[in-house]
Regions:
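Short, intrinsically disordered, charge-balanced linker/junction segments flanking boundaries
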Residues: 1, 211-213
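Secondary-structure end/capping motifs
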Residues: 179-210
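Small-residue-centered hinge/linker elements
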Residues: 1-87, 96-186
Length: 213
């Protein structure tokens, strides 16, 4: 759904008049970051506890972050929806709803975007650096002792181990498949069949609508 909006809703605290409760999901997702499961659990519970709540709006502006925290938030939204099936949940995207942000959004009944919003990035990322060549050039020797053959896996000062690299890639693939399934469960038959949908690409809001995102 395409939405051209100037958003200015507020969360009604404890009032009895009919209203839509607003929950802001703004920033990076992580246990110690702006968006985290603990704070969200408290916010959504207050929203449902507020008398007169007729709907819940998730105002999302997030590039993503922890898949664990995003998954916990997604699960909590779905849990609350089962308890309160008469209260719809809407995700309203501002500038960006990518990766973990989108992981959260798909738990909503409907997703609204601006035509220029950034949406998608359904993928998993793990990055790092390698300093082995630099160490050789400056004459630095790495002295590393471990108990457990894989304890120093992905150590940036050691050469890449192909078996360990394959292990990590498989782990990332598994998390990616979990993400894909969550999107499919949330969007259902609205998703269009495209090889790019789950590739990690992102789109503007207008294009995302055509893909069923």
């Amino acid at each position: 759904m395409l939405l051209f909006f100037a958003f200015g809703a507020t969360h009604t605290k404890g009032g009895s008049s009919n209203h839509a409760a607003l929950i802001e999901i703004n920033g990076v997702i992580g246990e110690k970051d702006e968006v985290n499961a603990k704070d969200f659990f408290e916010s959504i519970q207050r929203a449902y506890d507020s008398r007169g709540t007729k709907g819940i709006i998730l105002k999302i502006n997030s590039p993503g972050g922890s898949p664990v925290q995003a998954g916990m938030i997604n699960d909590e939204i779905k849990r609350q929806k089962k308890l309160h099936p008469h209260i719809p949940v809407y995700a309203v995207v501002e500038d960006i709803c990518a990766s973990g942000g989108y992981y959260i959004a798909v738990a909503a009944d409907e997703i609204f975007v601006d035509k220029a919003s950034i949406v998608g990035s359904i993928g998993v990322l793990m990055d790092g650096f390698g300093f082995t060549d630099t160490m050789k050039k400056v004459g630095v020797e790495r002295r590393l002792m471990t108990a457990g053959s894989n304890k120093a896996m992905l150590d940036p000062f050691s050469p890449v181990n192909s078996k360990q690299q394959a292990f990590v890639q498989e782990m990332l693939n598994q998390v990616h498949q979990q993400f894909i399934q969550v999107v499919k469960d949330g969007r259902g038959n609205r998703l269009k069949d495209s090889p790019d949908t789950f590739s990690g690409l992102f789109w503007n809001g207008e294009a995302a609508i055509k893909l069923g995102l």
